[in-house]
A protein has these predicted regions:
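Conserved catalytic core of nucleic-acid polymerases
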Residues: 14-21, 122-138, 149, 174, ...
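Flexible loop/turn segments at secondary-structure boundaries
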Residues: 71-72, 245-250, 256-258, 287-290, ...
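Function-dense linear segments that define catalytic or interfacial modules
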Residues: 237-324
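A common structural junction motif
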Residues: 469-481
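Short hydrophobic beta-strand that contains or immediately precedes a catalytic carboxylate
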Residues: 64, 279-283, 492
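Short, contiguous acidic/charged loop-to-helix segments that flank catalytic cores in large enzymes
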Residues: 132-134, 220-229, 261, 270, ...
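Catalytic palm subdomain of template-directed nucleic-acid polymerases
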Residues: 18-42, 292, 343-347, 451-469
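Conserved "right-hand" nucleotidyltransferase catalytic core of DNA-directed polymerases
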Residues: 1-261, 274-278, 352-360, 364, ...
Length: 507
């Protein structure tokens, strides 16, 4: 029954409205500093990329803001006719052989180019037409010979331009050439790393970082600056109805898109509204992994959570033993990635060894994933312990035995129960405790699986006691709400500091 979910949604709406009303204090001077920091990084990235593009493409002009021209650099080819290109591919029915043949027949290889001054306009890009009487018009016109650039670009046929990647399947075809989305660039970066293509790795890293910095400047720096009210507060809008899994999304700006981890400089601009106040973040430890351990009843996962096994150190050890030295911090990016559908494909051999090891180590999770797939095939839907249902009416089994929508089938139950059920019910519990104790400290945001509290300078110890009380009650709250025996420990870890970024663990 969805009765419990509806009740939780309605109850949470009240507390999200309170979060919006309270607002989150913003240091505008610090925000300007972050803007300058990102802008300087962006300028350097553009310079570095332009220098690298010059080496890869010769004098051929490339606009970094154009996905089409970026694809020229990456794939070293372009469609003969863009008008018919996108209609050539059916990613669901086209075989790999037909795809490769279609690409060969409908693209041309790009070569490095040499720029020579246009003799028609003498490099000015402008010409003056001649009147019938032989005199020149006073007004200039664009030179059509060089398209007003002042240069003619001549192919150097002995040197293919770009990184020379091949787009592997028809799903990589885009309207203007080939895909340059974030996930595709990450995949190609992994391939480049495997093949020792260091220049390609560096180029793709820079392109992805430039895209990220542009997003940070527009979505966060500009977004925060635009939506901060005259009282110096950003009133965080948290929405329950935009995501498939029920987890919260945001608007004006979407704070839920804030990168994970403790290094994102935008977090530094958020401070307490009180002089001497602090910001506390109560973060669930490995929440989605713990939920997956419970839902799958994987004995290894449950044992590791219960005993406090350091999974990140284990990840680092596996990858290092396979020949690629890796720190614990670096390993965090890999530890739970297989849980969300990531594989070793396109990664270094040492990293791929860990992804293979994950499947073997947590065989119970893998078995549960297969059970979910069978449930979706049989009923067209899957369920979570809270009563939420996810419909997959078009799910089928492919000829090779794999199941369509498998990534969503694996991810939705974990993400939904963790972030759409456990986090909200915990937020409500903590918010009620703060109010019941008539405290000025208040919840001002929640991102991913954390709860952010603006702590009054006289209430730090009281807030810590409330977080401790929540930890003691988490399992009881979850079990009582949904009639479960949640046999995996849940833990909120608190950090506190003068702003949202510069926080330290609370002993």
């Amino acid at each position: 029954s969805l009765d419990g979910t509806i009740r939780l949604t309605n109850q949470l709406a009240i507390h999200l409205a309170k979060v919006y009303q309270r607002g989150f204090s913003v240091d505008m001077d610090a925000l300007e500093g972050v803007r300058q920091e990102f802008q300087q990084e962006r300028d350097q990235l553009v310079r570095d990329l332009e220098e690298q593009i010059s080496e890869l493409m010769g004098d051929r002009p490339i606009n970094l803001n154009s996905p089409e021209q970026l694809s020229w650099v990456i794939y070293s080819k372009k469609p003969h006719d863009k008008k018919v290109w996108a209609d050539l591919f059916d990613s669901y029915r086209m075989s790999d052989t037909d795809y490769r043949s279609t690409v060969r027949q409908n693209t041309k290889t790009l070569y490095k180019q040499k720029a020579k001054q246009c003799t028609t306009c003498n490099g000015t890009g402008q010409i003056r037409k001649v009147k019938k009487d032989g005199t020149l018009y006073a007004r200039t016109n664009k030179c059509t010979t060089c398209d007003s650039s002042g240069y003619i670009f001549i192919d150097i046929h002995s040197s293919v331009a770009g990184l020379k990647f091949n787009a592997p399947t028809a799903k990589w075809a885009s309207a203007n050439g080939f895909a340059t989305s974030k996930d595709k660039l990450e995949y190609l970066e992994g391939i480049a790393r495997q093949r020792g293509m260091q220049d390609a790795v560096l180029f793709l890293q820079r392109v992805r970082r430039l895209s990220a910095v542009d997003t940070y400047l527009s979505s966060f720096v500009e977004g925060i600056s635009t939506h901060v009210k005259q009282d110096g507060l950003l009133h965080v809008r948290l929405l329950q109805h935009r995501t498939a899994t029920g987890r919260l999304s945001g608007a004006d700006p979407n704070m839920q898109n804030m990168p994970r981890g403790g290094t994102f400089p935008v977090k530094r601009v958020f401070k307490s509204r009180w002089t001497g106040g602090q910001i506390m973040e109560a973060d669930f430890a490995q929440l989605e992994f713990r939920v997956a351990a419970f839902l799958s009843q994987d004995k290894t996962a449950i044992d590791e959570v219960t005993t406090g096994f350091d999974v990140h150190s284990y990840t680092a050890q596996v990858i290092s033993d396979a020949g690629q030295t890796m720190s614990r911090q670096e390993a965090k990016a890999h530890t739970f990635a297989p849980l969300y559908g990531a594989s070793g494909f396109g990664r270094t051999p040492a990293e791929a060894a860990y992804y293979e090891q994950f499947t073997k180590k947590y065989s119970g999770i893998g078995k549960w994933h297969k059970e979910l797939a069978r449930e979706a095939l049989a009923t067209g839907k899957i369920k979570t312990p809270s009563g939420r249902e996810f419909s997959f009416p078009d799910v089928t089994r492919r000829a090779n035995g794999t199941v369509t929508f498998f990534t969503q089938i694996k991810n939705f139950p974990v993400q939904s129960f963790a972030t759409a059920d456990i986090v909200p019910i915990s937020l409500i519990y903590i918010d009620k405790l703060l109010e019941a104790n008539q405290m000025q400290s208040c919840i001002v945001n929640t991102v991913h699986d954390s709860i952010v509290i603006d702590v009054h300078p006289e209430e730090e110890e009281k807030v810590l006691r409330i977080i401790s009380a929540a930890n003691d009650k988490l399992l009881t709250i979850v079990n009582k709400k949904w009639g479960l025996d949640f046999n995996v420990p849940l833990l909120l870890e608190a950090k506190i500091g003068p702003n949202w970024l510069d926080t330290n663990d609370v002993a």
